[in-house]
Curated annotation (Swiss-Prot):
It comes from Dictyostelium discoideum. This is HssA/B-like protein 39. InterPro entries: HssA/B-like_chaperone (IPR050533), HssA/B-related (IPR008455). Belongs to the hssA/B family. Pfam families: Coiled (PF05710). One of its GO terms (biological process) is sorocarp development. Disulfide bonds: none annotated. Residues 1-21 are annotated as: Disordered. The gene is hssl39.
Length: 98
């Protein structure tokens, strides 16, 4: 769970951002002014499985097909950690309530 610890601290440091969110495969979320989207679309979901993304468009899914919590702009969850839009769409619907 070292990876999760580092992600948690990163999320905490970004909590001042309006769109900061950590989304999990179960659909629960931590953050403000946001709508969770089950951790992604097309992946197995869950922290260890594939689906943790941060609301700033960061893709931390490690190469899975799931998308980040907030749509990830043009990156579409290829695991490269690219920055995308913070208010994109997820599974065809709105994913960030900002």
């Amino acid at each position: 769970m070292t990876l999760f610890s580092s992600i948690s601290s990163m999320s905490t440091s970004m909590s001042g951002s309006k769109s900061s969110i950590a989304s999990f495969g179960s659909g629960t979320s931590m953050g403000s002014n946001s709508i969770a989207c089950g951790g992604g679309c097309g992946g197995s979901g869950g922290i260890l499985g594939s689906g943790l993304g941060l609301g700033l468009g960061l893709d931390l899914t490690g190469g899975s097909r799931s998308r980040g919590a907030c749509g990830n702009g043009g990156n579409r969850g290829n695991g490269n950690g690219g920055m995308g839009g913070g208010n994109g769409s997820c599974c065809g619907g709105p994913c960030c309530g900002i």
